[in-house]
Protein backbone atom coordinates (compact mmCIF):
# COMPACT_ATOMS: atom_id res chain seq x y z
CA UNK A 1 0.00 0.00 0.00
CA UNK A 2 1.30 3.43 -0.96
CA UNK A 3 0.19 6.47 1.05
CA UNK A 4 0.68 10.16 0.24
CA UNK A 5 0.45 12.70 3.08
CA UNK A 6 -0.06 16.40 2.36
CA UNK A 7 0.70 18.78 5.22
CA UNK A 8 2.19 22.19 5.96
CA UNK A 9 3.59 24.06 8.94
CA UNK A 10 6.24 26.46 10.13
CA UNK A 11 7.82 27.62 13.34
CA UNK A 12 5.83 30.87 13.01
CA UNK A 13 2.37 29.45 12.27
CA UNK A 14 2.84 26.25 14.24
CA UNK A 15 3.93 22.67 13.62
CA UNK A 16 0.82 20.90 14.90
CA UNK A 17 -0.29 19.52 11.53
CA UNK A 18 3.23 18.30 10.76
CA UNK A 19 3.67 16.59 14.14
CA UNK A 20 0.27 14.91 13.90
CA UNK A 21 0.90 13.53 10.42
CA UNK A 22 4.32 12.30 11.54
CA UNK A 23 2.69 10.52 14.49
CA UNK A 24 0.15 9.01 12.12
CA UNK A 25 2.81 7.99 9.59
CA UNK A 26 4.90 6.34 12.30
CA UNK A 27 1.82 4.37 13.41
CA UNK A 28 1.00 3.34 9.84
CA UNK A 29 4.58 2.21 9.29
CA UNK A 30 4.03 -0.46 11.96
CA UNK A 31 1.14 -1.89 9.97
CA UNK A 32 2.76 -3.10 6.79
CA UNK A 33 2.36 0.15 4.83
CA UNK A 34 5.31 -0.19 2.47
CA UNK A 35 5.61 3.40 1.21
CA UNK A 36 4.69 6.76 2.76
CA UNK A 37 5.55 9.99 0.92
CA UNK A 38 5.04 13.50 2.29
CA UNK A 39 4.13 16.51 0.15
CA UNK A 40 4.58 20.01 1.54
CA UNK A 41 4.75 23.64 0.46
CA UNK A 42 6.64 24.47 3.65
CA UNK A 43 10.22 25.56 4.22
CA UNK A 44 13.38 23.60 5.00
CA UNK A 45 12.61 23.34 8.75
CA UNK A 46 9.54 21.23 8.00
CA UNK A 47 11.30 19.15 5.35
CA UNK A 48 14.17 18.44 7.73
CA UNK A 49 11.80 17.37 10.52
CA UNK A 50 9.99 14.94 8.22
CA UNK A 51 13.24 13.50 6.84
CA UNK A 52 14.58 13.05 10.39
CA UNK A 53 11.67 10.65 10.92
CA UNK A 54 12.77 8.59 7.92
CA UNK A 55 10.17 9.66 5.36
CA UNK A 56 10.60 10.86 1.79
CA UNK A 57 9.47 14.46 1.19
CA UNK A 58 8.54 16.15 -2.08
CA UNK A 59 8.63 19.96 -1.94
CA UNK A 60 5.81 21.54 -3.95
CA UNK A 61 5.31 25.15 -5.01
CA UNK A 62 1.49 25.16 -4.96
CA UNK A 63 -1.58 22.90 -5.11
CA UNK A 64 -1.20 22.38 -8.86
CA UNK A 65 2.32 21.10 -8.26
CA UNK A 66 0.96 18.73 -5.59
CA UNK A 67 -1.66 17.40 -8.03
CA UNK A 68 0.99 16.81 -10.70
CA UNK A 69 3.21 14.86 -8.28
CA UNK A 70 0.29 12.85 -6.87
CA UNK A 71 -0.68 11.87 -10.41
CA UNK A 72 2.85 10.62 -11.05
CA UNK A 73 3.23 8.43 -7.95
CA UNK A 74 -0.33 6.95 -8.06
CA UNK A 75 -0.91 6.45 -4.31
CA UNK A 76 -3.61 4.13 -2.96
CA UNK A 77 -4.44 6.55 -0.15
CA UNK A 78 -4.08 10.33 0.15
CA UNK A 79 -4.18 11.98 3.59
CA UNK A 80 -4.52 15.77 3.85
CA UNK A 81 -4.05 17.57 7.18
CA UNK A 82 -5.17 21.16 6.65
CA UNK A 83 -7.68 23.55 8.22
CA UNK A 84 -9.00 24.85 4.89
CA UNK A 85 -9.14 22.31 2.06
CA UNK A 86 -10.62 23.93 -1.04
CA UNK A 87 -13.45 22.16 -2.85
CA UNK A 88 -11.76 22.10 -6.28
CA UNK A 89 -8.55 20.72 -4.82
CA UNK A 90 -10.46 17.98 -2.97
CA UNK A 91 -12.38 17.08 -6.13
CA UNK A 92 -9.19 16.81 -8.19
CA UNK A 93 -7.35 14.73 -5.57
CA UNK A 94 -10.38 12.42 -5.29
CA UNK A 95 -9.87 11.37 -8.91
CA UNK A 96 -6.24 10.34 -8.28
CA UNK A 97 -6.56 7.83 -5.42
CA UNK A 98 -8.61 4.93 -4.09
CA UNK A 99 -9.17 6.47 -0.67
CA UNK A 100 -9.09 10.10 0.50
CA UNK A 101 -8.78 11.15 4.14
CA UNK A 102 -8.97 14.63 5.69
CA UNK A 103 -7.78 15.74 9.12
CA UNK A 104 -8.91 19.00 10.73
CA UNK A 105 -11.08 20.16 7.85
CA UNK A 106 -14.41 21.78 8.86
CA UNK A 107 -15.37 22.61 5.26
CA UNK A 108 -18.45 20.54 4.23
CA UNK A 109 -18.12 21.46 0.55
CA UNK A 110 -14.76 19.67 0.34
CA UNK A 111 -15.48 16.98 2.96
CA UNK A 112 -18.09 15.42 0.67
CA UNK A 113 -15.24 14.17 -1.55
CA UNK A 114 -13.48 12.36 1.31
CA UNK A 115 -13.93 8.76 2.38
CA UNK A 116 -12.94 9.66 5.94
CA UNK A 117 -12.91 12.95 7.86
CA UNK A 118 -11.21 13.14 11.27
CA UNK A 119 -11.93 16.30 13.26
CA UNK A 120 -10.62 15.45 16.71
CA UNK A 121 -10.68 19.05 17.91
CA UNK A 122 -11.81 21.44 15.17
CA UNK A 123 -15.61 21.47 14.95
CA UNK A 124 -15.99 18.61 17.46
CA UNK A 125 -17.15 20.65 20.49
CA UNK A 126 -14.94 18.12 22.33
CA UNK A 127 -17.69 15.50 22.00
CA UNK A 128 -16.72 12.03 20.81
CA UNK A 129 -18.98 10.79 18.07
CA UNK A 130 -18.79 8.86 14.83
CA UNK A 131 -21.27 8.78 12.00
CA UNK A 132 -21.56 7.69 8.39
CA UNK A 133 -22.88 10.12 5.78
CA UNK A 134 -24.98 7.82 3.59
CA UNK A 135 -25.37 10.38 0.80
CA UNK A 136 -21.66 11.05 0.28
CA UNK A 137 -20.38 7.73 1.74
CA UNK A 138 -18.12 9.59 4.16
CA UNK A 139 -17.17 8.27 7.61
CA UNK A 140 -16.76 11.06 10.18
CA UNK A 141 -14.74 10.84 13.41
CA UNK A 142 -15.22 13.65 15.93
CA UNK A 143 -13.69 14.34 19.33
CA UNK A 144 -10.47 13.82 21.34
CA UNK A 145 -10.95 10.05 21.28
CA UNK A 146 -9.60 10.25 17.74
CA UNK A 147 -6.43 12.20 18.47
CA UNK A 148 -3.31 10.45 17.17
CA UNK A 149 -0.71 10.85 19.90
CA UNK A 150 3.00 10.28 19.51
CA UNK A 151 4.05 6.76 20.45
CA UNK A 152 6.14 8.06 23.36
CA UNK A 153 2.93 8.99 25.19
CA UNK A 154 1.51 5.46 24.98
CA UNK A 155 4.80 4.08 26.36
CA UNK A 156 5.00 6.59 29.21
CA UNK A 157 1.36 6.02 30.16
CA UNK A 158 2.10 2.32 30.73
CA UNK A 159 4.96 3.26 33.05
CA UNK A 160 2.82 5.72 34.98
CA UNK A 161 0.05 3.21 35.71
CA UNK A 162 2.26 1.45 38.26
CA UNK A 163 3.38 4.63 40.03
CA UNK A 164 1.73 6.26 43.02
CA UNK A 165 0.88 9.94 42.65
CA UNK A 166 2.11 12.71 44.92
CA UNK A 167 -0.55 13.82 47.37
CA UNK A 168 0.47 17.44 46.97
CA UNK A 169 1.69 19.53 44.06
CA UNK A 170 5.49 19.69 44.10
CA UNK A 171 6.57 19.63 40.46
CA UNK A 172 5.00 21.95 37.88
CA UNK A 173 5.57 22.10 34.12
CA UNK A 174 4.90 25.33 32.20
CA UNK A 175 4.56 24.98 28.41
CA UNK A 176 2.87 27.52 26.14
CA UNK A 177 3.81 26.35 22.66
CA UNK A 178 6.08 27.58 19.91
CA UNK A 179 5.88 31.35 20.38
CA UNK A 180 3.70 32.13 23.45
CA UNK A 181 2.54 35.46 21.94
CA UNK A 182 0.89 36.63 25.18
CA UNK A 183 4.01 35.82 27.24
CA UNK A 184 1.99 33.64 29.59
CA UNK A 185 5.23 31.90 30.56
CA UNK A 186 6.54 34.93 32.48
CA UNK A 187 3.13 35.84 33.90
CA UNK A 188 2.54 32.35 35.31
CA UNK A 189 6.11 31.96 36.54
CA UNK A 190 5.97 35.25 38.44
CA UNK A 191 2.72 34.29 40.12
CA UNK A 192 4.12 30.93 41.21
CA UNK A 193 7.36 32.48 42.48
CA UNK A 194 5.44 35.06 44.48
CA UNK A 195 3.69 32.37 46.52
CA UNK A 196 4.95 31.19 49.90
CA UNK A 197 5.27 27.59 48.70
CA UNK A 198 8.37 26.23 47.01
CA UNK A 199 7.66 24.44 43.74
CA UNK A 200 10.07 22.66 41.42
CA UNK A 201 9.24 24.35 38.12
CA UNK A 202 10.10 23.09 34.63
CA UNK A 203 9.69 25.67 31.86
CA UNK A 204 9.55 24.64 28.18
CA UNK A 205 10.30 27.44 25.71
CA UNK A 206 9.25 27.18 22.08
CA UNK A 207 11.60 28.03 19.20
CA UNK A 208 9.93 31.43 18.64
CA UNK A 209 9.69 32.57 22.27
CA UNK A 210 10.51 36.31 22.19
CA UNK A 211 10.65 37.20 25.87
CA UNK A 212 13.91 35.66 27.09
CA UNK A 213 15.25 38.99 28.39
CA UNK A 214 12.12 39.47 30.48
CA UNK A 215 12.37 35.86 31.67
CA UNK A 216 16.01 36.28 32.73
CA UNK A 217 15.21 39.50 34.61
CA UNK A 218 12.36 37.74 36.36
CA UNK A 219 14.61 34.90 37.52
CA UNK A 220 17.14 37.39 38.90
CA UNK A 221 14.49 38.99 41.11
CA UNK A 222 13.61 35.80 42.99
CA UNK A 223 15.86 33.77 45.24
CA UNK A 224 13.88 30.63 44.42
CA UNK A 225 15.10 30.62 40.83
CA UNK A 226 17.38 27.67 41.61
CA UNK A 227 14.18 25.58 41.66
CA UNK A 228 13.54 26.41 38.00
CA UNK A 229 14.80 24.49 34.96
CA UNK A 230 14.52 25.90 31.45
CA UNK A 231 14.15 23.50 28.48
CA UNK A 232 14.38 24.13 24.74
CA UNK A 233 14.09 21.82 21.72
CA UNK A 234 12.49 18.94 23.64
CA UNK A 235 12.64 15.64 21.74
CA UNK A 236 10.50 13.59 24.15
CA UNK A 237 7.82 15.69 25.81
CA UNK A 238 6.18 12.66 27.42
CA UNK A 239 9.34 11.85 29.40
CA UNK A 240 9.48 15.42 30.69
CA UNK A 241 5.78 15.52 31.52
CA UNK A 242 5.64 12.29 33.51
CA UNK A 243 7.51 13.59 36.56
CA UNK A 244 5.22 16.59 37.07
CA UNK A 245 2.17 16.87 39.31
CA UNK A 246 0.61 19.74 37.36
CA UNK A 247 0.97 21.15 33.85
CA UNK A 248 0.11 24.77 33.00
CA UNK A 249 -0.55 25.34 29.32
CA UNK A 250 -2.95 26.72 26.71
CA UNK A 251 -5.72 24.60 25.16
CA UNK A 252 -4.32 22.37 22.45
CA UNK A 253 -2.22 19.23 22.07
CA UNK A 254 -0.16 19.75 25.24
CA UNK A 255 -3.37 19.91 27.27
CA UNK A 256 -4.68 16.69 25.74
CA UNK A 257 -1.33 14.91 26.10
CA UNK A 258 -1.19 15.81 29.81
CA UNK A 259 -4.76 14.62 30.43
CA UNK A 260 -4.00 11.41 28.51
CA UNK A 261 -1.13 10.74 30.93
CA UNK A 262 -3.43 11.43 33.87
CA UNK A 263 -1.75 14.70 34.87
CA UNK A 264 -4.06 17.58 35.86
CA UNK A 265 -3.75 20.83 33.96
CA UNK A 266 -4.38 24.52 34.40
CA UNK A 267 -5.52 25.99 31.09
CA UNK A 268 -4.95 29.65 30.13
CA UNK A 269 -6.10 31.22 26.86
CA UNK A 270 -3.69 32.93 24.49
CA UNK A 271 -6.47 34.61 22.51
CA UNK A 272 -10.22 34.91 21.96
CA UNK A 273 -10.24 32.17 19.31
CA UNK A 274 -9.10 29.63 21.92
CA UNK A 275 -11.75 30.93 24.30
CA UNK A 276 -14.49 30.48 21.68
CA UNK A 277 -13.37 26.92 20.90
CA UNK A 278 -12.90 25.61 24.43
CA UNK A 279 -14.73 27.79 26.96
CA UNK A 280 -18.08 25.98 27.10
CA UNK A 281 -16.50 22.59 27.72
CA UNK A 282 -13.80 23.74 30.14
CA UNK A 283 -16.35 25.61 32.24
CA UNK A 284 -18.29 22.37 32.72
CA UNK A 285 -15.38 20.25 33.93
CA UNK A 286 -13.11 22.75 35.70
CA UNK A 287 -12.54 22.94 39.45
CA UNK A 288 -11.67 26.55 40.10
CA UNK A 289 -11.21 26.00 43.84
CA UNK A 290 -8.18 23.80 43.12
CA UNK A 291 -6.55 26.28 40.75
CA UNK A 292 -3.23 27.62 42.10
CA UNK A 293 -3.52 30.64 39.77
CA UNK A 294 -5.89 33.59 39.67
CA UNK A 295 -7.09 32.83 36.15
CA UNK A 296 -7.68 29.85 33.90
CA UNK A 297 -9.34 26.50 34.47
CA UNK A 298 -8.13 23.58 36.57
CA UNK A 299 -8.91 20.25 34.90
CA UNK A 300 -8.56 17.04 36.90
CA UNK A 301 -7.54 14.28 34.49
CA UNK A 302 -9.47 11.65 36.45
CA UNK A 303 -12.76 13.46 35.96
CA UNK A 304 -12.95 14.03 32.22
CA UNK A 305 -14.98 12.06 29.69
CA UNK A 306 -12.66 12.70 26.77
CA UNK A 307 -11.31 9.14 26.24
CA UNK A 308 -8.26 10.77 24.64
CA UNK A 309 -6.49 8.70 21.99
CA UNK A 310 -8.57 5.55 22.53
CA UNK A 311 -9.82 5.54 18.93
CA UNK A 312 -6.38 5.12 17.38
CA UNK A 313 -7.05 1.67 15.92
CA UNK A 314 -10.38 2.81 14.48
CA UNK A 315 -8.46 5.43 12.49
CA UNK A 316 -5.78 2.90 11.43
CA UNK A 317 -8.47 0.50 10.20
CA UNK A 318 -10.32 3.22 8.32
CA UNK A 319 -7.14 4.11 6.45
CA UNK A 320 -5.73 0.64 5.76
CA UNK A 321 -8.73 -1.63 5.21
CA UNK A 322 -9.36 -2.31 1.54
CA UNK A 323 -11.08 -5.66 2.23
CA UNK A 324 -14.52 -4.41 3.26
CA UNK A 325 -16.64 -6.07 0.57
CA UNK A 326 -17.15 -9.66 -0.59
CA UNK A 327 -19.46 -10.99 -3.27
CA UNK A 328 -21.39 -14.04 -2.01
CA UNK A 329 -23.94 -14.54 -4.77
CA UNK A 330 -25.04 -13.33 -8.16
CA UNK A 331 -26.76 -10.25 -6.73
CA UNK A 332 -25.57 -10.16 -3.13
CA UNK A 333 -22.57 -8.86 -1.21
CA UNK A 334 -21.32 -8.71 2.34
CA UNK A 335 -20.01 -5.27 3.28
CA UNK A 336 -18.47 -4.29 6.60
CA UNK A 337 -18.01 -0.70 7.76
CA UNK A 338 -17.15 0.68 11.16
CA UNK A 339 -20.02 0.93 13.63
CA UNK A 340 -21.11 4.52 14.22
CA UNK A 341 -23.31 6.24 16.79
CA UNK A 342 -26.31 5.73 14.49
CA UNK A 343 -25.94 1.95 14.79
CA UNK A 344 -25.88 1.80 18.59
CA UNK A 345 -29.59 1.27 19.25
CA UNK A 346 -29.76 -1.65 16.83
CA UNK A 347 -26.54 -3.11 18.25
CA UNK A 348 -28.00 -2.92 21.77
CA UNK A 349 -31.16 -4.68 20.59
CA UNK A 350 -29.04 -7.51 19.18
CA UNK A 351 -26.90 -7.71 22.32
CA UNK A 352 -30.08 -7.83 24.45
CA UNK A 353 -31.55 -10.81 22.59
CA UNK A 354 -31.34 -13.90 24.87
CA UNK A 355 -30.76 -16.10 21.81
CA UNK A 356 -27.52 -14.14 21.32
CA UNK A 357 -26.28 -13.17 24.78
CA UNK A 358 -26.60 -16.73 26.09
CA UNK A 359 -23.32 -17.29 24.22
CA UNK A 360 -21.62 -14.27 25.87
CA UNK A 361 -19.36 -15.13 28.78
CA UNK A 362 -20.40 -12.36 31.20
CA UNK A 363 -23.77 -10.93 30.14
CA UNK A 364 -26.75 -12.75 31.67
CA UNK A 365 -29.63 -10.32 30.99
CA UNK A 366 -30.71 -7.62 28.53
CA UNK A 367 -28.61 -4.47 28.55
CA UNK A 368 -29.55 -1.07 29.87
CA UNK A 369 -28.70 1.86 27.63
CA UNK A 370 -26.24 3.31 30.16
CA UNK A 371 -24.32 0.01 30.27
CA UNK A 372 -24.28 -0.27 26.50
CA UNK A 373 -23.19 3.32 25.88
CA UNK A 374 -20.50 3.18 28.59
CA UNK A 375 -19.07 0.04 26.94
CA UNK A 376 -19.12 1.75 23.55
CA UNK A 377 -17.33 4.89 24.71
CA UNK A 378 -14.65 3.12 26.77
CA UNK A 379 -13.49 0.64 24.10
CA UNK A 380 -9.76 0.72 23.43
CA UNK A 381 -7.38 -1.17 21.11
CA UNK A 382 -10.43 -2.42 19.27
CA UNK A 383 -12.44 -1.96 16.06
CA UNK A 384 -16.13 -2.84 15.59
CA UNK A 385 -17.85 -3.21 12.23
CA UNK A 386 -21.50 -3.39 11.27
CA UNK A 387 -22.24 -6.19 8.78
CA UNK A 388 -24.30 -5.07 5.80
CA UNK A 389 -26.05 -7.47 3.44
CA UNK A 390 -26.58 -5.99 0.00
CA UNK A 391 -29.13 -7.84 -2.12
CA UNK A 392 -30.22 -6.40 -5.45
CA UNK A 393 -30.79 -2.71 -4.64
CA UNK A 394 -31.35 -2.98 -0.89
CA UNK A 395 -28.85 -2.82 1.97
CA UNK A 396 -29.70 -3.97 5.49
CA UNK A 397 -27.78 -4.28 8.73
CA UNK A 398 -27.60 -7.89 9.84
CA UNK A 399 -24.88 -8.21 12.50
CA UNK A 400 -21.53 -7.05 13.82
CA UNK A 401 -17.96 -8.28 13.91
CA UNK A 402 -15.10 -6.95 16.01
CA UNK A 403 -11.43 -7.37 16.72
CA UNK A 404 -9.94 -6.42 20.09
CA UNK A 405 -6.51 -6.59 21.78
CA UNK A 406 -4.97 -4.93 18.74
CA UNK A 407 -2.13 -3.76 20.97
CA UNK A 408 -0.95 -7.40 21.19
CA UNK A 409 0.44 -9.78 18.56
CA UNK A 410 -2.62 -12.06 18.87
CA UNK A 411 -5.85 -10.04 18.56
CA UNK A 412 -9.25 -11.48 19.44
CA UNK A 413 -12.19 -11.73 17.03
CA UNK A 414 -15.87 -11.70 17.95
CA UNK A 415 -18.98 -12.06 15.77
CA UNK A 416 -22.74 -11.88 16.11
CA UNK A 417 -25.47 -12.15 13.50
CA UNK A 418 -28.32 -10.12 14.94
CA UNK A 419 -30.98 -11.20 12.45
CA UNK A 420 -31.39 -14.81 13.55
CA UNK A 421 -33.42 -15.80 10.45
CA UNK A 422 -30.13 -15.39 8.55
CA UNK A 423 -28.24 -17.87 10.75
CA UNK A 424 -26.73 -20.66 8.70
CA UNK A 425 -26.33 -18.47 5.59
CA UNK A 426 -22.52 -18.16 6.10
CA UNK A 427 -22.72 -14.39 6.59
CA UNK A 428 -20.63 -14.65 9.76
CA UNK A 429 -17.94 -16.72 8.04
CA UNK A 430 -17.64 -14.25 5.15
CA UNK A 431 -17.50 -11.31 7.56
CA UNK A 432 -14.78 -12.86 9.72
CA UNK A 433 -12.79 -13.70 6.58
CA UNK A 434 -12.79 -9.99 5.64
CA UNK A 435 -11.41 -9.12 9.08
CA UNK A 436 -8.73 -11.82 8.81
CA UNK A 437 -7.64 -10.42 5.42
CA UNK A 438 -7.30 -6.96 6.93
CA UNK A 439 -5.29 -8.26 9.91
CA UNK A 440 -2.95 -10.17 7.61
CA UNK A 441 -2.55 -7.18 5.31
CA UNK A 442 -1.37 -4.92 8.14
CA UNK A 443 1.12 -7.45 9.47
CA UNK A 444 -0.52 -9.61 12.13
CA UNK A 445 0.58 -13.26 12.07
CA UNK A 446 -2.19 -14.85 14.14
CA UNK A 447 -5.57 -14.25 15.74
CA UNK A 448 -7.83 -16.01 18.22
CA UNK A 449 -11.44 -16.36 19.34
CA UNK A 450 -12.92 -17.27 22.73
CA UNK A 451 -15.90 -19.61 22.33
CA UNK A 452 -18.18 -21.25 24.90
CA UNK A 453 -18.09 -25.02 24.53
CA UNK A 454 -21.87 -25.21 23.87
CA UNK A 455 -21.74 -22.65 21.04
CA UNK A 456 -21.62 -25.25 18.29
CA UNK A 457 -22.55 -22.84 15.49
CA UNK A 458 -19.66 -20.50 16.34
CA UNK A 459 -17.21 -23.39 16.68
CA UNK A 460 -18.11 -24.61 13.18
CA UNK A 461 -17.76 -21.08 11.78
CA UNK A 462 -14.24 -20.55 13.10
CA UNK A 463 -13.08 -24.09 12.30
CA UNK A 464 -14.21 -23.56 8.69
CA UNK A 465 -11.73 -20.65 8.55
CA UNK A 466 -8.82 -22.73 9.88
CA UNK A 467 -9.05 -21.97 13.60
CA UNK A 468 -7.85 -24.77 15.91
CA UNK A 469 -8.78 -25.38 19.53
CA UNK A 470 -5.52 -24.71 21.39
CA UNK A 471 -6.19 -24.25 25.11
CA UNK A 472 -8.75 -23.87 27.84
CA UNK A 473 -10.03 -20.39 28.48
CA UNK A 474 -12.29 -19.43 31.33
CA UNK A 475 -14.90 -21.83 32.72
CA UNK A 476 -16.77 -23.65 29.91
CA UNK A 477 -14.71 -21.75 27.33
CA UNK A 478 -12.07 -22.70 24.78
CA UNK A 479 -9.58 -20.60 22.85
CA UNK A 480 -9.33 -21.18 19.10
CA UNK A 481 -6.34 -19.80 17.17
CA UNK A 482 -5.38 -19.38 13.52
CA UNK A 483 -2.13 -18.50 11.76
CA UNK A 484 -2.55 -15.80 9.13
Curated annotation (Swiss-Prot):
Chain ranges of the N-acetyltransferase domain: 334-484
Gene Ontology molecular-function annotations: acyltransferase activity, transferring groups other than amino-acyl groups; hexosyltransferase activity
UniProt name for this protein: Uncharacterized protein MJ1062
Organism: Methanocaldococcus jannaschii (strain ATCC 43067 / DSM 2661 / JAL-1 / JCM 10045 / NBRC 100440) (Methanococcus jannaschii)
Upper taxonomic lineage: Archaea, Methanobacteriati, Methanobacteriota, Methanomada group, Methanococci
Amino acid sequence: MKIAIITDGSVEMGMGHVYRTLSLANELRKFNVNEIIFFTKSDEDVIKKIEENGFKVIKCSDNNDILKNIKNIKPDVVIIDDLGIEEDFAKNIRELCKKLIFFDNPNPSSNKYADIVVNAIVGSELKNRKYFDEENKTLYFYGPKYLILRNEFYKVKKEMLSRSKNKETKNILIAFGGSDPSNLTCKVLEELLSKDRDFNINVVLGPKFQYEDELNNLLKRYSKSDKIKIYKNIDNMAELMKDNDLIITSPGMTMFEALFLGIPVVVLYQNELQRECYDDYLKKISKTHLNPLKEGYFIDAEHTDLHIGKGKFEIIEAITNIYNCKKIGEDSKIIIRQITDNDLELLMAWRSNPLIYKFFYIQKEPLKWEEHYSWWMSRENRVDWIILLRENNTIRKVGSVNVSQLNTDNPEIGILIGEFFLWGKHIGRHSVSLVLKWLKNIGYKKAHARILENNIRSIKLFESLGFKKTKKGRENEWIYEVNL
